[in-house]
C-alpha cells in the first residue's frame, strides 16, 4: 500500500481498451437538478460492486437535486466470479451475475482503474460522446468512495488529480491508513516505524453489526 498523504510523481504506462458500467440516478426534471454530480467509486472489496455511499445518503441526494453516478472501476466488480448469494440473488461480478446483459463489458485490470474512474468523471463533465445525464448541465463533480474505495480515492487525489483536475472535490469516507496501489504489479513495502490504525467507535459498531448479520462468531 502507498502512503496516503503525499503527492506522487506519476507517468502514463500502457494503454488498453475497456468497456465498463455506469449506474446513474438523476432528476427526471432538469429544473430540479442542483448542478452537482456525485461520482462514486463502487466498493468491490466483497467481490461485487456495492454503492456504499449511495445506500447511506441517497434520500438526501434525491431530496436536494443531486445526480449520482456509480462507476464499476475495478476488475472484480466486472469480471469477478459468483462469491455468494443473498435475498436479492447471486453476488459477484456483473458478467457472472447476468452474462447476457453484461457480455460487452471488458476490464483490462486494476492498473487501469484510476483512468477508468477519471474518464467517468470526464463523461459527466464534458460530454463529447454518450450523455449519461441526458442533457443536465453540470456545474460541480464530486468524487466519493467508501471504504476500500476510499483508499483508491486517496490515491487519485495524490496522483491523478494534480495532473487532470477532473473533480471539484472529494469525500474520502473511512479509508485505511494507506492509499490504494497504483498498479497490479509488485508493490514496494517499507514500514520503518511502528504504527497504529485507529477506527472510530461508529466504524467498530458498524463492523460488529455486519459480522453479526453474516454469522461471524466474535
Name each model-derived stretch.
Residues 1-218:
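C-terminal His-loop and adjacent cap/lid subdomain of alpha/beta-hydrolase
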Amino acid at each position: 500500500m502507498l502512503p496516503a498523504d503525499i503527492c506522487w510523481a506519476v507517468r502514463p504506462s500502457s494503454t488498453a481498451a475497456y468497456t465498463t458500467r455506469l449506474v446513474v440516478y438523476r432528476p427526471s426534471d432538469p429544473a430540479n437538478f442542483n448542478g452537482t454530480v456525485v461520482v462514486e467509486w463502487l466498493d468491490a472489496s466483497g467481490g461485487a460492486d456495492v454503492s456504499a455511499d449511495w445506500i447511506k445518503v441517497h434520500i438526501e441526494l434525491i431530496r436536494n437535486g443531486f445526480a449520482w453516478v456509480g462507476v464499476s472501476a475495478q476488475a472484480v466488480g466486472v469480471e469477478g466470479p459468483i462469491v455468494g448469494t443473498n435475498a436479492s440473488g447471486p453476488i459477484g461480478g456483473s458478467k457472472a451475475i447476468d452474462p447476457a446483459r453484461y457480455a460487452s463489458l471488458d476490464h483490462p485490470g486494476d492498473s487501469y482503474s484510476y483512468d477508468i474512474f477519471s474518464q467517468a468523471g470526464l463523461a459527466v463533465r464534458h460530454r463529447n460522446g454518450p450523455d449519461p445525464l441526458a442533457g443536465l448541465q453540470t456545474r460541480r463533480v464530486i468524487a466519493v468512495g467508501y471504504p476500500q474505495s476510499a483508499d483508491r480515492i486517496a490515491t487519485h487525489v495524490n496522483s491523478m488529480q494534480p495532473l487532470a483536475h477532473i473533480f471539484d472535490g472529494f469525500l474520502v469516507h473511512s479509508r485505511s491508513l494507506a492509499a490504494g496501489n497504483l498498479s497490479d504489479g509488485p508493490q514496494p513495502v517499507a514500514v520503518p516505524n511502528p504504527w497504529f490504525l485507529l477506527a472510530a467507535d461508529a466504524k467498530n459498531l458498524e463492523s460488529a453489526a455486519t459480522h453479526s448479520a453474516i454469522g461471524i462468531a466474535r
